């Protein structure tokens, strides 16, 4: 069972009990994706899906397991429960669990006693699921995990996130090239102009270290991007030449969206790997969210809350510049952008 809303930062409290030994858990920042590796040329309807994300464990088949933190379909146990928290558990009775997820800091409590904590940013938002795994049936009788008094405090995204788009006009932005950028129904719409060439909509302000996020919806096939540390020179024929690092945005499934490409210089900074959870996280024909964090030489990107790449650049060429939305040659149908934010007071 899952909550049909995604949560990033939150506090969740609930009670649970198991009348028979069983494995269950509370999954959070979770995504429903194909099981990896996906066979080459596999069709979506032929793929087998499962959950990817974090889990606060409920495990009563062994003594010390409830309250630990796991990564489902990934690294396994990330933190075991503390001895003090396990002692608070009541066998066959109701137990209280609390989960705090604020940025990369995740804590699990049992009866207000800290059970496990991690600092991890592989998943920064996703769904919440209640899980039961009946791997063994006792005397042909069903086993279950019971949940009650489920309460969640949605904290949104902690921090001073400042909007770069006012939802009304393109104040604070500048158009480079012949492509058309307009505001329609509160979103930025980029479409091919008469030359069907390459164009950019760039912020007037520049950044060095930053964390930014934006939602996009592709209107068709093509190639797009979210650039940072950028500058643009115009050729005599009016064609814009950008110097910057591109966070790729493209409609493939699997997708290369979120991987890093340095235009006109080194190309792919990391060769895209399409056998990762993030490569299957794109939602075709729907809104998606890209996020990028850059501090010094280190850049991290996420697609729909799943980490795509973490890259330490050994020889960066660019250290400051503006953000730019790209409409590349071939993206004739266009792209829409909204909810563009940058985090002030980055730590």
Describe every region a protein language model picked out.
Residues 1-347:
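Carbohydrate-interacting regions of secretory-pathway proteins
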């Amino acid at each position: 069972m899952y909550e049909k809303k995604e949560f990033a930062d939150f506090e969740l409290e609930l009670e649970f009990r198991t009348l028979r030994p069983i494995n269950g858990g509370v999954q959070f920042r979770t995504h429903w994706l194909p099981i990896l590796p996906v066979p080459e040329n596999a069709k979506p309807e032929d793929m087998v899906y499962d959950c990817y994300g974090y889990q606060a464990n409920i495990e009563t088949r062994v003594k010390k397991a409830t309250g630990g933190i796991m990564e489902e379909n990934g690294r396994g146990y990330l933190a075991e429960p503390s001895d003090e928290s396990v002692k608070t558990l009541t066998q066959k009775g109701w137990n209280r669990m609390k989960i705090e997820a604020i940025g990369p800091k995740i804590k699990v409590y049992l009866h207000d006693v800290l059970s496990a904590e991690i600092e991890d940013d592989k998943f920064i938002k996703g769904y919440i699921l209640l899980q039961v795994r009946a791997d063994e049936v006792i005397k042909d009788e069903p086993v279950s995990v019971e949940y009650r008094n489920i309460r969640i405090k949605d904290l949104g995204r902690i921090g001073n996130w400042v909007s770069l788009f006012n939802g009304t006009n393109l104040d604070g932005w500048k158009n480079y090239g012949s492509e058309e950028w307009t505001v329609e129904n509160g979103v930025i719409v980029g479409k091919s102009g008469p030359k069907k060439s390459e164009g950019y909509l760039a912020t007037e302000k520049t950044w060095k270290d930053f964390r930014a996020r934006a939602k996009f919806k592709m209107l068709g096939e093509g190639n797009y991007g979210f650039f940072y540390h950028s500058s643009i020179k115009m050729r005599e024929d009016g064609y814009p030449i950008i110097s910057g690092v591109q966070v790729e945005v493209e409609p493939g499934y699997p997708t290369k969206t979120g991987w890093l490409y340095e235009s006109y210089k080194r190309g792919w900074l990391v060769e895209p790997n399409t056998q990762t959870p993030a490569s299957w996280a794109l939602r075709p024909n729907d809104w998606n969210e890209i996020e990028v964090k850059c501090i010094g030489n280190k850049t991290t990107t996420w697609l729909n809350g799943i980490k795509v790449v973490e890259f330490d650049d050994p020889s960066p060429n660019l250290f400051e510049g503006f953000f730019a939305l790209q409409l590349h040659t071939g993206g004739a149908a266009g792209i829409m952008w909204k909810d563009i934010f940058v985090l002030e007071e980055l730590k």
